[in-house]
Amino acid sequence: MIAGMFIRNFKTYQGINYIPIADLQNLSGFLGNNGIGKSSILEAIDTIFNDNSWNYNIVVKKGGLDKTAPYIVPFFILEYDFFNDEILPYAKAIDHIARNIKEDDATNATTKEVISNFILHRKRLFDRYDLSNKLLLPIGQDYNKSISLSIFGGKSLNMISEANFDGISLSREKIISNDYSDFSPLLSYILDYLEYLYIPKEIDSELFTKLESSGTQVLMGESLHAILDRIIGETTVTDINKELNTFLEEISDKLVNYSYRTPTDRQKKIQKREVYNLIIQAFFSVRKLHRKQSEEQYLEINNLSSGEKQKAIIDVAHALLTKHHQNGEKLIIAIDEPESSLHMSACFEQFNALS
């Protein structure tokens, strides 16, 4: 899970901040006034996972990127067996730092407060869960897409530099120059195996719930191309090409001195991807989500109220995750204001579905 996040000069958050995100394993929520930074947290994680553009804090415009050095560092808690043998030593190295960092490791008053906040949250997690078989992993990226360890770099990382730590050797020269590229495979591994789906408040419910949308395919746990591959497959596409070529040969024989060909010597065949794209365009794109009103009456999602649209998104997400997705434990869903525009009586049902 993502237990917390270190964030610097991103959107609402100025300077270095530690944000506790999760005390529970399945569901976490944020409460607070508008503008306090709830959406910023969800958007920041989306930036790391899905390579979206950075939404910098206003101080970045005044001071410049080099001086303000924005970064986003999620604090992951993952099982040992999540990692392969090649990546595991790097994960254990960061885990060692995260478990042992203390306030005395701070280089100034600001980082001391951040470390203190992290230690308080770490203690709360230790009190609630047995984390002996899990790894504590604060790792993310800065504005240059370079590896960032936030407060765990520099002096903290020196604890294991120039030493063979469980099979890996870290260079003191790299650490001094804030180069943590040795841990790049670790972050890539995590981001490749986990999925993060962010549903912002202002999302277009019609576009999001279409079967060909990236969000719906993430919820299904497979792409439409993978589904069509099961239905159609390589053999069918090969047969189509064979029959089409036979037809062209018959036409050419009848035309004698003329032939239908491509400009090059190599005659193009229909690719599987092209067939699938045509099917998606002709079959799936014309279909929209409808809510069943009665046995014979359906209401298009665009005609629902704002609250009903929000509920429809949650209903679709819940149904696909619980009834279709084969590996939902590796998917993290972040929903901005899931109760938006809902009547108070419907809020409990909405949150119950999310949990």
What annotation goes with each model-predicted range?
Residues 1-221:
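P-loop NTPase switch/coupling surface
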Residues 197, 201-335, 344:
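Extended helical coiled-coil dimerization/tether regions that scaffold
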Residues 1-56, 289-355:
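Switch/communication elements of ASCE P-loop NTPase nucleotide-binding domains
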